[in-house]
UniProtKB/Swiss-Prot annotation:
Subunit (UniProt): Interacts with PCNA. PCNA stimulates the nuclease activity without altering cleavage specificity.
Source species: Methanosarcina mazei (strain ATCC BAA-159 / DSM 3647 / Goe1 / Go1 / JCM 11833 / OCM 88)
NCBIfam families registered for this protein in UniProt: fen_arch (TIGR03674)
Region of interest: Interaction with PCNA: 330-338
Taxonomic placement: Archaea, Methanobacteriati, Methanobacteriota, Stenosarchaea group, Methanomicrobia
Entries under CDD domains matching the protein: H3TH_FEN1-Arc (cd09903), PIN_FEN1 (cd09867)
GO process annotations (BP): DNA repair; DNA replication, removal of RNA primer
Binding annotation for Mg(2+) 2: D173, D175, D236
The name this protein goes by in its record: Flap endonuclease 1
Coiled-coil residue windows: none
Physiological role: Structure-specific nuclease with 5'-flap endonuclease and 5'-3' exonuclease activities involved in DNA replication and repair. During DNA replication, cleaves the 5'-overhanging flap structure that is generated by displacement synthesis when DNA polymerase encounters the 5'-end of a downstream Okazaki fragment. Binds the unpaired 3'-DNA end and kinks the DNA to facilitate 5' cleavage specificity. Cleaves one nucleotide into the double-stranded DNA from the junction in flap DNA, leaving a nick for ligation. Also involved in the base excision repair (BER) pathway.
């Protein structure tokens, strides 16, 4: 999922309150994938309704978004469009991993190994078209705006921040920086304790903010060189150079200046290198969008979540009330400007 340059970035711990009154462009695909991975039963089974349809994403989207807007955050979800042709290899590899993980999950369940079952179940998660359409509808009736990107959601989210239509991008991946996002927030969808795979150890998952300029200054490079580092390590569009991690890539780029000089020096080749860079420097994005928050529709929320998907009516009503209260507070803040 994206490029592995996290060790090079300057991360700062923040609180939800630090994002109050800020517009956050949320990488929808990334966030839904998190919900599908995390919101599971002990044996790894996702939440489902009486028809066997997965509802983990709906649960995460409703309750976490309610918490965000309650904290004064203004989320706008950005959905992926058609992936670039150069991403086909990565998508095929992800499909193979999901299928293999699903088989291992079933075997672990049959053996009664719940820890292994949960681990493999998480890796088998898939955001399909039904999940996307249900998520968009839920956001609509929650009064939360969403935008359809023509291509990569992270590129569109970065574009919105650069246009000052949003204050930061929310994503677990680091690709947003390659697309030019000035500020990225991580762990917005889930904070708290997380168990390390295969170990009886729990770590704190805290909200992080990363500033692109701060990172570039600390590393002594520019954004173009950061893109070169990512390509050396590997991106969704290329495999990267053999035995080159982020720290080695940084040294190589600082020594030689750019990736063309690096591959010349090493006698290597990266297929379609200039086309890969072009995907980051000139991504396919749109200005045809509107960001507008509305009021939640309690009746439609109850019908969709409770009647159709077997959610607890009491919990849905409480979440709707939280969304309404936040919507009222948002309107009151707007009124103060006039």
């Amino acid at each position: 999922m994206g490029t592995d340059i996290g060790d090079l970035l300057q991360k700062r711990k923040i609180e939800l309150s630090d994002l109050s009154n800020r517009v956050v462009a949320v990488d929808a695909f990334n966030t839904l994938h998190q919900f599908l991975s995390i919101i599971r039963q002990r044996d790894g089974s996702p939440l489902v309704n009486s028809q066997g349809k997965v509802t983990s994403h709906l649960s995460g989207l409703l309750y976490r978004t309610a918490s965000l807007v309650e904290a004064g955050i203004k989320p706008v979800f950005v959905f992926d469009g058609k992936p670039p042709e150069m991403k086909t290899g990565t998508l095929n590899r992800r499909k193979e991993i999901r299928e293999s993980s699903k088989e291992k999950w079933e075997n672990a369940k049959a053996e009664g190994n719940l820890e292994a079952a949960y681990k493999y179940a998480q890796a088998s998660s898939k955001v399909d078209q039904d999940i996307i359409e249900d998520s968009k509808y839920l956001l609509d009736i929650m009064g939360i705006p969403w935008i359809q990107a023509p291509c990569e959601g992270e590129a569109q989210a970065a574009h919105m921040v650069l246009k000052k239509d949003a204050d930061c991008v929310a994503s677990q991946d680091y690709d947003s920086f390659l697309f030019g996002a000035p500020t990225v927030v991580r762990n917005l969808a889930a904070t708290g304790k997380r168990k390390l795979p295969g170990k009886n150890v729990y770590v704190d998952v805290e909200l992080e903010m990363i500033e692109l300029e701060e990172t570039l200054d600390s590393l002594g490079i520019n954004r173009d060189q950061l893109i070169d580092i990512a390509i050396c390590v590997g991106t969704d569009y290329n495999k990267g150079l053999e035995k080159v991690g982020p720290k080695t890539a940084l040294k190589l780029i600082k020594k030689h200046g750019n990736i063309h000089a690096v591959i010349r020096e090493k006698g290597m080749e990266i297929e379609a290198l200039d086309s890969i860079k072009e995907l980051f420097t000139h991504p396919d994005v749109t200005d045809d969008y509107e960001i507008k928050w509305g009021k939640p529709d309690s009746e439609k929320l109850i019908n969709f979540l409770c009647d159709e998907n077997d959610f607890s009516e009491d919990r849905v009503v409480k979440a709707a009330d939280r969304l309404k209260a936040a919507s009222g507070a948002r309107q009151q803040t707007l009124d103060q400007w006039f």
